[in-house]
Amino acid sequence: MANTDILEQLEQLKYFLATAPANWRSEQAIRKFMLPNGEYVSCILWKNLFHITGTDIVRCLVFRFQAFGRPVKNIKKFEEGIFSDLRNLKPGIDATLEEPRSEFLEMLYKNNCIRTQKKQKVFYWY
């Protein structure tokens, strides 16, 4: 992949992250951005708030590291570190804490935004 392609993809991701909640259609629940590896990052509208999952945050960071020539060698350790940092974000202020198999988690799981329906935080977009 050429450097200009990578830089363009980084700019597109940056633009998506900055603008995904804008110009939302009333019937829309999820807006997706496809990363070069075929995975998606999603902006989710739920109960009039925009959200992003920890899984999607990890996906964004893995792509950015790869784009800058620093591929993640141990994805499990990398994820553990990111999720450890995300624990500092507080439910009700920075995130919603969803109970196992909640309606919201079920929707996120069906749309490949999360890997498990265990109790977890889903983060507010802004």
Residue ranges of each PLM-predicted region?
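Detector for Asparagine
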Residues: 3, 23, 37, 48, ...
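Residues that form generic nucleotide/phosphate-binding pockets
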Residues: 16, 64, 85
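Conserved, ordered domain cores of eukaryotic regulatory proteins
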Residues: 36-74
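Chromatin/DNA-recognition segments of nuclear transcriptional regulators
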Residues: 75-126
